[in-house]
Amino acid sequence: MKMDTGYDKMNIIFRIFCVYDEPSADLCLHKDLHLSNVHHLAVKRDGVQSIQIEQESACSIIYREETAGMLHIIFHIDVNSAYLSWTAVEQLKNGADVDIRTIPAIIGGDRESRHGIVLAKSPSAKKFGIRTGEPVVNAFRKCPNLHMDPPNHRMYREYSRRLMDFLKTYTPEIEQVSVDECYMDFTGIAQRFSSPVEAAYEIKARVYEKFGFTVNVGISTNKLLAKMASDFEKPNRVHTLFPEEVKEKMWPLPVSELFMAGKSSVAILEKLEIRTIGELAKTDPKLLEFHLKSHGRTLWEFANGIGDAKVQSEETAAKGVGNSTTLPKDVEKAEDAKKVLFSLAESVGKRLRKAGQKANMVSVEIRYSDFQNVSHQKQLGRASGADQVIYEAACSLFDELWNGKPIRLLGVRTAKLVDEDEPEQLSLFDLQFEVKSEKPKKSMEKLKKLSAAMGEIRGKYGADAVIRGSVLEQREKEKKYEKKQF
């Protein structure tokens, strides 16, 4: 089905629920679209409809109307080689003769010892085959005359703050996901511009004019596709990746370029002879779930362009409870990371109970040693404030997210909070078990009582009065590491 790409004419959005001959995706219809190629249209209950399209081998598509009115348009704004760009701008302000963005240059490590990893690189350095995340010593082997500056994270945070403050002059609907990237919900300000592309070019130009560094802007109907679009050709570019462009622009890419497709997942996919995003999109999701568990379904949805369109601004994010920690030493083993996650889950659970609240959603954040941030979230089966429930959800998310790289920071956050005494809506699955046995219900009650009791003991006698064996073991490791350092 051919569709006009004039998104200012968009009136109705439909989400495909089931496709018999083609993979599931978002389908966008315009108010002036002529349905001359629709073979059959049948209205069913709850607004669910079924159509057959002659041009697509009469494949059946079941969809539901999602929104009437303006389509959600999301921008992903990403600073090009942020650490190097910000360092270059600061050096030029202080009278430097050379712009390090124009020469082979990197940010990372110690200049004298040449230890550490490459955190950012210039386009010229990239031509020598230098990659972000590789050891600095390797970079110097590839380019002996390489210029290197150490990182200055205080300066990066200041430039990041200035950028976010500027973007908020357009709209407060900004979700910052790392020091150098954010999502913007363009929907509320669409009437001020002739098109999203025009707005993106204006933002990009004004950022350069005001600050002296460049950004890429990706545009789509959800955060996933906007993120993928901004990662296309760099620097200083605007790219679109609307649902009808996925097949042409995204499917030919290697599966390793799909968001959240880590090394271990890619290795499994390649064993299944799935090498492109398009091949992944056309694979039976049940097969992917068999090999990659729930992460397989997530990757299948991403390959088909299905993602979240909700931008979580600071105001929205504040309606949650979370905790994160920067680790004294990069963590390289999953078992060590999960001990940290347990400690964080305990902290979050304690704060929830103190506030008399339960959470319906848990999210996990990972920051790697190269300062790349990734995060993901999941709905709980029922609202909970129990440490163990939060911990198990966090571990599940961690297993989906972690790509094997050394970890510098871990965070656990809960959202969609409700009052602790709010009645619980049990699922059919829960009811089945409670009819046969009271064990699941009793188990949940025990978890709540245990968490509350531990919290009470710590409140009276201090945080270390009750410590899980796994947490104690992790602390002993950290103490040994600190002794070695001094």
Q: What are these regions, as identified by a protein language model?
A:
Residues 5-9, 21-23, 27, 31:
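Alpha-helix boundary/capping motif
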Residues 16, 34, 52, 56-301, ...:
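Gly/Gly-Pro- and Ser/Thr-rich, intrinsically disordered tail segments characteristic of DNA damage-repair
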Residues 7-12, 16, 20, 37, ...:
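Short, positively charged and aromatic/hydrophobic N-terminal segments
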Residues 221-224, 305, 358-369, 407-418, ...:
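A glycine-rich phosphate-binding loop feature that marks nucleotide/adenosyl-phosphate handling sites
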